[in-house]
């Protein structure tokens, strides 16, 4: 498998996705448009690039931690998933989580980060039950959504 990612620059006025520091896992994605996000609102924001994720890998679009913590800018479907077969422009579903202040995103602002990771492409096999399939019960069972205990103050 290659260690390169094919990128098409759809907007020549924007930089290619890039790492802020050597060794960073993600590459920063830039906004291709000016957007004002009122409190609680969301927008699908163009990045001006398309990528060809290699087969057996997935692209994951994550919020930039500084923007999330400082101004409440996040991603609606975090992380966004880019499948290997998708070849269109990357778009980021941004949301303003601040309860009072609009967020202004300017063209050229770094708005998200793209991580590319290997993914196991498992074959789905229908079984009538996990016991019949020889998959032993676990201590967790079907417990979910807080079944392992809450926060000390809740």
Curated annotation (Swiss-Prot):
Its EC number is 3.6.1.23. InterPro entries: dUTPase, dUTPase-like, dUTPase-like_sf, dUTPase_trimeric. The lineage of its organism: Bacteria, Bacillati, Actinomycetota, Actinomycetes, Mycobacteriales. GO terms for biological process: dUMP biosynthetic process; dUTP catabolic process. This is Deoxyuridine 5'-triphosphate nucleotidohydrolase. GO terms for molecular function: dUTP diphosphatase activity; magnesium ion binding. Transmembrane segments: none annotated. Pathway: Pyrimidine metabolism; dUMP biosynthesis; dUMP from dCTP (dUTP route): step 2/2. Its cofactor is Mg(2+). The keyword Ion transport does not apply. Pfam families: dUTPase. Keywords: Hydrolase, Magnesium, Metal-binding, Nucleotide metabolism. The gene is dut. Each trimer binds three substrate molecules. The ligands are bound between subunits, and for each substrate molecule, residues from adjacent subunits contribute to the binding interactions. It catalyses: dUTP + H2O = dUMP + diphosphate + H(+). Substrate binds at residues 64-66, 77, 81-83, 91. This enzyme is involved in nucleotide metabolism: it produces dUMP, the immediate precursor of thymidine nucleotides and it decreases the intracellular concentration of dUTP so that uracil cannot be incorporated into DNA. It is an enzyme of class 3 (hydrolase). Belongs to the dUTPase family. Homotrimer.
């Amino acid at each position: 498998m290659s260690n390169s990612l094919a990128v098409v620059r759809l907007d020549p006025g924007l930089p290619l996705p890039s790492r802020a520091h050597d060794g960073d896992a993600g590459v920063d994605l830039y906004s291709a448009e000016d957007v004002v996000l009122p409190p609680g609102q969301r927008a699908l924001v163009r990045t001006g690039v398309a990528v060809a994720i290699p087969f057996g890998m997935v692209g994951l679009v994550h919020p930039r931690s500084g923007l999330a913590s400082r101004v409440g800018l996040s991603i609606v479907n975090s992380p966004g998933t880019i499948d290997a077969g998708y070849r269109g422009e990357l778009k980021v579903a941004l949301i303003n989580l601040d309860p009072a202040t609009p967020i202004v995103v300017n063209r050229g602002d770094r708005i998200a980060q793209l991580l590319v990771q290997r993914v196991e492409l498992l074959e789905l096999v229908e079984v009538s039950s996990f016991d019949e399939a020889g998959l032993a019960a676990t201590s967790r069972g079907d417990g979910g959504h807080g079944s392992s205990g809450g926060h000390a103050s809740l």
